[in-house]
Amino acid sequence: MDSYLPKSYPSLMEGKKILYVHGFLSAGSTHTADVLRQFMPRATVLAPDLPVHPADAMALLKETVESERPDLIIGTSMGGMYTEMLYGFDRICVNPAFEMGATMSEHQMMGKQTFQNPRQDGVQEIIVTKALVKEYREMTEHCFSQVTAEEQQRVFGLFGDEDPIVHTYDLFLQHYPQAIHFHGEHRLVEKAIYHYIIPIVRWIDDRQTGRNRPSVLIHWDTLADAYGQPRSSLHKAYE
């Protein structure tokens, strides 16, 4: 697998704060947060461990955004669901689990579960009960409750075209216009961050700083062969 970590963008989000909101059974120590730090070495990436109970997690996130005032919030899966509700900030929701209760019931997330990443509190396992699933169902009822025209311009949704777990693209699009599919699954890997997250972060950073970048538009026909297939030059430009 190609590694994209040697590539970094020191000026991207320089001096700014990014809040990363992890997914279910993950933690702030997730590799995704480390990748964001390596791509943007002069930005501060905050990645707190979230409490298991959604009301507690949402309270922690609201306290965090009030005290830290992040310039950008990025959330994945369950974290994408929470991120949508952190109104007043620029946000990127990746494979957001807006139907978290149903997702937990349908994808073997009941009973004893092990955290995928180390937590600061040392907890390694939890028991997912019907009561906890009900808490998540109730939390997701608050999604999209404060969508305005201004919020619609501040939120981006990214959805893996091969995601076997979360399918909320159409639901997101009912409330926010800036939604795209990317080639990938549910878990956010380095390649997806490099090709899809970083360009959106750059656009947000430019908008925040009032920067206008020169653009060169290349028509698809110039990069396709006689059979309509991509030339090697297209692959090189993409990579």
For each of these PLM feature ranges, what is it?
Residues Y4-E14:
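Short beta-strand-to-loop junctions in surface cap/lid or active-site-entrance loops
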Residues L12-S67, H186:
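Active-site catalytic motif of lipid deacylating hydrolases and related acyltransferases
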Residues E84-D90:
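Glycosyltransferases and closely related glycan-assembly transferases
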Residues R213-E239:
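Alpha/beta-hydrolase-fold serine-hydrolase catalytic core, especially in secreted/extracellular enzymes
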Residues Y20-F24, I74, L158-G160:
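Short hydrophobic segments within beta-strands
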Residues I74-E84:
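Gly/Ala-rich beta-loop-alpha elbow adjacent to hydrolase catalytic centers
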Residues D90-W220:
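The alpha/beta-hydrolase serine catalytic core
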